[in-house]
Amino acid sequence: MDRLDASIKSYPHAEGIEAIMTQTDMTPLQRLAKVLQLGTPSNYRNHTYINGESLYFPTGRVYGGQVIAQSLMAASRTVAPSRLPNSIHGYFISAGDIRQDLLFDVENLRDGRSFSARRVNVTQAQGSILTAIASFQEHDQEGIEFADPMPENIPDPDSLTSAKQLMEPYAEQSPFAKYYAEKSPFDIAM
């Protein structure tokens, strides 16, 4: 356990939430790409440990979609490049703090001829925040696919009002509005 505790450290990239929020040297999309790159992996037995940081979110908590994406990225670093994500299942244990680094503990469950399976446990100083299991499959092997047909008579996404457009008038009145108007790497059409 000492090895895990030594790897968990306070958020080294900023002095508090305000500094994270006011990072202006990168666009929101560039910040997202940087967060998804994660740190340098270190190996111990059949585990790989990788540090990651968080994007700003107005609550001060780690956004769940971010940590799921980072878990998939961490797991993908431990499989052959020819294996692509097949599935991921995640279970949120507790809220994460954006001021602390995330530690991704990737356990190699199995490497078969066609599939690889990984378990990812994401921790911070207070303990586990997410546990996920990811499966990867050789890219040239096709399996059974299921998909519903695309619905008809739905509006074109570009014709819809974006979250950014809706939130801009309220950006100075609400941290959430400011986030969606200026800081979010995603723009949601409604």
Label the model's feature ranges.
Residues 4, 8-190:
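Terminal targeting signals and extreme-terminal segments of soluble enzymes
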